[in-house]
Amino acid sequence: MKEVTRERMDAFCEYLINEEKSEATVSKYLHDVAVFAEWLGTRDLEKIVVVEYKACLCEKYASASVNAALSSLNCFFAFCGWYDQRV
């Protein structure tokens, strides 16, 4: 089952640090994933749900901000091996 857990986020943080991402980048990526996880709640993590999240972001933020958040999520999904969730 695809879930955004504390353990996965901790492992993702370690991965980003090992990839020599800046502290600001690590912080931003983790923030974006945490916001998504909160929005996701108990829903199943499926591509259609990620597309819905993108639509919600597009209603509130400029396209550059939306793209930055989606980049964070896509990196997290790739890290988890969830390539079919990326948008």
Describe the function of each predicted region.
Residues 9-87:
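N-terminal core-binding DNA-recognition domain of tyrosine recombinases/integrases
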